[in-house]
């Protein structure tokens, strides 16, 4: 039993260290897409309607939020977005939520159950997630009015407007 606890504990610590190094490397070296044009995508919303990035943005700055229903940190960021969405829209910034590889029924049930009134696109095949080099969730991409990626964060910072200029 002691051996199981010892090796089990070591496995947990090793996993935590590897995850920390992965995120630190992402933050230290930056995302290779910063400064580049945001990749165009076509995704469906929860009602099955297709949307493209350019169709939603219409030349405005945008915040892309990659998330998943199973992610506890994503849930807290969804709550923040839900509270601030009107203020963000008043500033002329579009918010695009992209759920990672889950079905629209599952996502809709989650949104309804949690009283979230945000528009969601679903990346069921993972292509958009791959195009945006998502290291983990939650991940926010800040896209300027010119369509270039300005910053990548794992939370919605208070100074998000500065990141978009």
What annotation goes with each model-predicted range?
Residues 6, 14-40:
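N-proximal helix/coil linker or "cap" segments that precede and/or mark the start of modular domains
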Residues 42-62:
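A short beta-strand-turn-helix
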Residues 60-62, 67-70, 136:
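Short pre-active-site segment immediately N-terminal to redox-active cysteine/selenocysteine motifs
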Residues 66-83:
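Conserved redox-active cysteine motifs that mediate thiol-disulfide chemistry
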